Amino acid sequence: MAAMKKAMKVKKSAKKSAKKSGKKGGMKKKAKRVSKVARGKRAKSSVFRGTKERTSGGLTKNSLVKNKQGRVVSKKQSEHGKKIFKKHGLQKWIDAVTKARKALGIKGFQAVGGSSAKGKILLAKSRSFYKK
């Protein structure tokens, strides 16, 4: 038992040596470089305004344009969309429906087709104008 109850040895305190001085001076931290690339939801608008240089997709100010609603969109995509709208007959159909609404004297909302009698008449009239 005497062996187990040995008193803990007291550590001799080492002589304190003179503290070494740390690095003197050093380099000044550089400010972070401001990004020229616009990211996120308002990326195109910030490039269009001129606050950023380009979008993450690579669009620059000269490749952006405002659409009818005032949104900043890609010039190339906008032109392509307009071309497809005319090419695939959607423009022709919209013109036909507009003409039919005018001929039938329909104002306000009216579903083309559907279950109502007015809607069915409008659809038939629209189709007749579309085929011409």
Curated annotation (Swiss-Prot):
GO terms for molecular function: DNA binding. It is found in: Nucleus; Chromosome. Transmembrane segments: none annotated. Keywords: Chromosome, DNA condensation, DNA-binding, Nucleus, Phosphoprotein. GO terms for biological process: chromosome condensation. Pfam families: DVNP. Its main location: nucleus. GO terms for cellular component: chromosome; nucleus. Residues 1-44 have a biased composition (Basic residues). Residues 1-84 are annotated as: Disordered. Residues 57-66 have a biased composition (Polar residues). Phosphorylated. In yeast, DVNP5 binds to histone binding sites in chromatin and displaces nucleosomes, and impairs transcription and inhibits cell growth. DNA-binding protein, which similarly to histones, may compact DNA into chromatin. This is Dinoflagellate viral nucleoprotein 5.
